[in-house]
Amino acid sequence: MEVAIPKDLQQEASLAKKRYMDLCRQGQIFDARNRIIGGDTQAWDVQVRNQKIKEVTEKARDETFAAEMRHNDKVMCIMHDRELRHRKQLCRAINDFQQRFQKPETRREFDLSDPLALKKELPARVSDNDMRNTISGMQKFMGEDLNFQERKRIQKEQNREWSLQQHGEWERAQAEHKLAEHLHTQTELKFDEAARDLQRLEITTRKAVCAAVKEFNKKQVVELAERKRQVKQQEQEDNMSEITNLLHGDLLSENPQQAASNFGPRHVMLDRWKGMNREQLEEIWSTWKQQIHEKLRLQEEERQHNMDWDLRRTRKAHASLLQERQQQRLLREQRRALDCSNLSLAKQQYLQKRQLDAAPSSQPTEDYFSQFNTRSR
């Protein structure tokens, strides 16, 4: 198993940060909507303004065409109605002319001696199998037999039966669909009822568990209070015993022999020792004064050392400030030179663009654009 050390974790975090920054830079370069690097914002603004002007112009032209089309449709409807009225009037005039001036008795084939001769003649065909009904006579075509009406009636009856059958099948399908929906609804209701029962059971179980936990917590609190009371009572008894022992012991009675030790005269029992004599106190005071002088000397040396380091840090900070100001001055000069160079390049690109726009050129293909912006840098 590999063990991750802090150095590896720091290196991995640095690489992840670099990858994230590269992805952000690629999004700023390759994303057409959010790209802010490598683009001409002024040209984009001009394109957007031209596109809006084009859209407004096209919208006005479409509205003009639509108004003209509505006008033409209205004119066509008026002319169509006028033509229909003209045809009706012409047909009515023809019928009136035929009824007035083209009567049957004025025709050339009308026989004065037998006015009903045409009515007495045999029809063009007596039946569908008439011998006179030849092909050249053109008296019978497909669907023009004498049983056409009967066949038409049978077809209508058959269509009606089919329609009734389809309607019955549709009603049965609707009934089956309603039955399926009813069964589905009943199943959902059963599932909902079961879910509600389970939910009620869960709530009841949860309440029982909460009540049991609450009762257990109450018992724990009572037991804890009892233990605390017993501990406090035992502590009070111990304190009373200790106070009694101290009151009747050698410490408060100031017995000088109580501090004597079995290890020699220079050893004492600290819990019974009442203090030192004058010689011991003077020796301790002398040692303490020497320690004070030594500590003052060390503090003075440390202060002098700190002053030297402060002076060095001040000089170094002053030098760093001067160097930083020099660096900022150089950066401003470089930035000013870069701005001038960018301005001249922008002017050259603008002139080249105007020349390219003025000169005829072929439409670039997708292969031409795919060779640019293949990397983030």
Curated annotation (Swiss-Prot):
Comp. bias regions, Polar residues: 360-377
Keyword annotations: Cell projection, Cilium, Coiled coil, Cytoplasm, Cytoskeleton, Flagellum
Coiled-coil region list: 188-238
UniProt key word Coiled coil: yes
One GO BP: flagellated sperm motility
First-listed, main subcellular location of the protein, grouped into a coarse class: cytoplasm
Gene Ontology cellular-component annotations: axonemal A tubule inner sheath; axonemal microtubule; sperm flagellum
Record localization: Cytoplasm, Cytoskeleton, Cilium axoneme; Cytoplasm, Cytoskeleton, Flagellum axoneme
InterPro entries named among the record's database cross-references: RIB43A (IPR008805)
Disordered: annotated segments: 355-377
Role of this protein: Microtubule inner protein (MIP) part of the dynein-decorated doublet microtubules (DMTs) in cilia axoneme, which is required for motile cilia beating.
Family of the protein in this entry: Belongs to the RIB43A family.
Summary of subunit composition and partner proteins: Microtubule inner protein component of sperm flagellar doublet microtubules.
PANTHER family membership: RIB43A-LIKE WITH COILED-COILS PROTEIN 2, RIB43A-RELATED
Name under which the protein is recorded: RIB43A-like with coiled-coils protein 2
Classification lineage: Eukaryota, Metazoa, Chordata, Craniata, Vertebrata
